[in-house]
């Protein structure tokens, strides 16, 4: 399990002895993976399916930072390779998701009242991302803090905070 937070500038890794049971998780003994050279307020994290690419959403830099990992899900083997500025659509990005093949990316956050869709011409390569459209959530009167899709991409789930 991997966690980022706005008060730190790193990715924290946890090991769970039982699948999907957070009561069995403990923080790994190694140092957290610093993303301070890319953003001081990481707010979201995602991986490609085999863990060889990690994406960290930066609330401060208003961008998506891409890392290549030579060994899947091993943060000690990751290095920064690209970023995508999303400030034109979301000035305080907090939530991110990809479709299953990495050709679509979705961003939501505090500043906008919408989910922004991007097409990636090369799967899981944010440098090839192009803004497509935005889906308004104004009628739900909240700010997006979490974003996920079901396995077939037909249902979108949002976590909202009302302020």
Region spans (language model):
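Residue-level detector of Asp-centered blade-edge/turn motifs that repeat once per structural unit
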Residues: 49-50, 100-101, 151-152
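Conserved small/polar residues in nucleotide/adenosyl-binding loops
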Residues: 161-163
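A short beta-strand motif characteristic of beta-propeller blades
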Residues: 29-35, 81-87, 132-138
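Short loop/turn segments immediately following beta-strands, especially the blade-tip
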Residues: 15-23, 68-76, 119-127
